Amino acid sequence: EVPKTLDEFYDLLVRFRDDDPNGNGEQDEIPLSGSDGMTYLRQYLVPSFGIKKFDMEEKDGEVRYAPASEDAREYYKFMNKLYEEKLLDQEVFSQSGDQKKAKGESDRLGVYHDWFSYFTSGKEEEEAVTDPMFHPLTSEWQAEPLAPIKTGINRSTAAITTANEHPEATMRWLDGLYDPEIANLMSVGPEGHVWELDDNGKRQYTEAAQGDVEEVRSKVAPNYGLEFPGYHQDKEDYDGPDLTIGDEENPFITFVKQETADKIDPYGEVPLPDLYLSQEEIDKTQAIIGDLETFIEQEEAKFITGQKDINDDAVWEQYLQEIESMGLDTLVEAYQAAYNRWVEAGEQIN
C-alpha cells in the first residue's frame, strides 16, 4: 500500500533499494530521486515535520521562517539519513531534469517528483494510472496528514509601463484573467485544438489531443508551464476535467481527480495568504529574502550530504545565528505586520 506515515515511507524506500523491484537482477534502483536539489521534493516531505512551506509560513496565527525552526532540523536529519543509506539519489543536487528522466525511463526510480508521473517514467498516459500519487505522511512531528495548497488566486507578476497609452484597458484585460471562463481558456486553449464541443454542447478532446493532450496543450495554452495571473480556485472550471473522449472521460484525468480528492483535498492548508507588503517593508526585506534563499539552499545541501553534521548542536546554533544575522527579525516582523493587516481586512469584510 501507499505509505501514510514517515516510518512506512522509509520502509518502502528500503524495499526499493534492496528487493530489485524492476526485476533485472541488479541493485540499480534509486528509491527517491529529484532534480534541482530539493526544490521540488522538499514540498512533499517537509509537511511530515509540521512545515507547510520551507519559507515564510503561518503557524497558529504567527508568522515564522520555517528553515530556522526545530522542525527544519528534524527534516534535515531525516534527509541526511536517507542520503547516507543511499535511499536518496546521490546526484539529487547536481542532476538536471533530463538526467532524472533518463533514470525514470530506465525503470530505476521508486519515488520522484513531476507534474505527471509519465513525464519522468516515459510511459504512455493510459499506463500511468498504475503509478499512485504520493500521500501526505504523518509522523511524531505531524499527527494529521498535511498538504500545502495554493490560495486559488495566482497573482504572478504584471507591469504597466509609462509607454502604455491605455493603462485602463490593460487593467481590464488583467482583471479578466480571473474570470473562470478566461482562466479555462488560458489553461486549455481555444476551441478546436485541445477540445471541441460535441452535439450536446459538452466539451470533449479533439482527435489530436487524444494522442497526447499535453503535447497539444503545450502549443496553444498561454499559461502552459508559466505563472500567469489568474483564477485557479474552481478545478472544474480551470482544469477542464469535463473533457471526454466520446462519452467517456479521459481515464488519466479521472485518475488524477480521484487521487487529488483522496490525498490532497482533505488535508489542504494554505501556508501563508497572499500578502501585500508596504513599500517600506519591501525595501527592508528584499535583500534579506535573496540572501536567505541562497544561504538556505547551500546549507540544506551541506546538512543532507553530511558536509555539515546536523546532529552537532554547535553546528546547528551557528546555522541559526547566521540566519539571524541576515535580518531574520526584520523579515518576520514585516510579514507578521502584513499578515495582521490581512486578518483585519477579512474581519472587516465579514
What positions do the PLM features span?
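Active-site-adjacent "gating/activation" loops or surface patches in catalytic cores
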Residues: 56-61, 75, 126-153
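Secretory-pathway/luminal and periplasmic proteins that interact with or process carbohydrate-rich
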Residues: 17-27, 38-45, 51-54, 109-114, ...
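Ligand-binding clamshell of periplasmic/extracellular solute-binding protein-like
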Residues: 3-10, 32-49, 111-121
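Beta-sheet entry/capping signal
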Residues: 27-33, 108-112, 128-133, 157
